[in-house]
Amino acid sequence: MGRKMRGAAAAAGLWLLALSSLLTLWGGLLPPRTELPASRPPEDRLPPHPIQSGGPAPEPRFPLPPPLVWDARGGSLKTFRALLTLAAGADNPPRRHQDDRGRHEPSGLSWPEERRAVHGGVFWSRGLEEQVPRGFSEAQAAAWLEVARGARVVALDRGGCGRSSNRLARFADGTRACVRYGINPEQIQGEALSYYLARLLGLQRHVPPLALARVEARGAQWVQVQEELRTAHWTEGSVVSLTRWLPNLTDVVVPEPWRSEDGRLRPLRDAGGELTNLSQAELVDLVQWTDLILFDYLTANFDRLVSNLFSLQWDPRVMHRATSNLHRGPGGALVFLDNEAGLVHGYRVAGMWDKYNEPLLQSVCVFRERTARRVLELHRGQDAAARLLRLYSRHEPRFPELAELSEPHAQLLQRRLDFLAKHILHCKAKYGRRPGDLITLRGREGLGYE
């Protein structure tokens, strides 16, 4: 009996040995195991802070270009050409399908790369842009136009709205508004054009919604403040601007990169490491400041940061004090106030102030990607003034009551956009990751902001 059991055990051992050899042979014929890359969060859903366990990533505030495709060596298979190409409907939220709910598309970028303040060498990161306060929305702008046009003014008070000729108005429903009366009509024209240029560039979150009104002492809107109108010495029939009065605004001091006592600006760029040690709040502030500098260059506004630069010649500490016509709202958004020096009056005296405006612009080599796209599109279209006036006339019924942008000023607006576009390309060539890449834009389809 024992002999039979030993024989059975030996036979079983031989079978196991044969099976092991067969499995080894099969394993040698299979292709080597392919390691899947570690899953990474998509770049366009990067949260500003590490997400707590189980917390979903916030949706991006603006539609973003699709993630870049990366090859095995870590290089992009798409060039900067694709990065700044405007896809159809680029400003509309992407449609979500049921099949996409659980889909995860890794961006191919490592975590340290995605958490940088700048991507592509010259663009603020998308995660950082998500932290910029919302400011004024399109819905607020539309609501204000409706309120201001139908409002009855019941009081006009001095103070609280800038220049002494302006007034703080109170409407019958209790709403307060700043009424700006220009020393000459071109100031109100410049204020209105600057507002609609901000909308054309996607910067309306920083500029208070504006409506125009005609001063008519016996008209329904002004009949209850006839005495105040006489005291203000406003000319009958003048066009004024109405913007909602904003409470709880605070002063704003120029951030460190431009706080120079020797009159020399420090270029703001990522390559030199100027952004390395800044806090997230400081970086969010810089995102807004770079938009402001681009906006003031395009409008030739000399009554904000440029006036500080001019004053450095006799006041070396001016950059450490509040900036004119710039405030911060309770939510943290910068508010670009009193833009009446822009476009019209600013263009008339541009030759005097561009020695400050151009170096200020050239001190910036990091941009909001959305703003850069629109600048480059307007540069390519060569019809910026036509688009501006089309947008203006579509939303403002009193548009015909103020002079349009003159042809010389329309040409100057286009030249300034061209100069800005070339500056963006120069920064990309100098500081971008792929200096040889080109930038092209499609036609005018899919802009969605006129």
Swiss-Prot record:
Expressed in brain, kidney and lung. In the telencephalon, expressed in the piriform cortex, hippocampus and olfactory bulb. In the diencephalon, expressed in the dorsal thalamus. Expressed in Purkinje cells of the cerebellum and in numerous medullary nuclei. Residues 93-111 have a biased composition (Basic and acidic residues). Residues 36-61, 88-111 are annotated as: Disordered. It comes from the Eukaryota. Induction: Up-regulated by Notch. One of its GO terms (cellular component) is extracellular space. Glycans are attached at N248, N277. It is found in: Secreted. Residues 1-28 form the signal peptide. Keywords: Glycoprotein, Secreted, Signal. Its main location: secreted. Glycosylated. Undergoes proteolytic cleavage. GO terms for biological process: retina layer formation. Belongs to the FJX1/FJ family. Acts as an inhibitor of dendrite extension and branching. Knockout mice for this gene exhibited an increase in dendrite extension and branching of pyramidal neurons in the CA1 region of the hippocampus. This is Four-jointed box protein 1. It comes from Mus musculus (Mouse). The lineage of its organism: Eukaryota, Metazoa, Chordata, Craniata, Vertebrata. The gene is Fjx1.
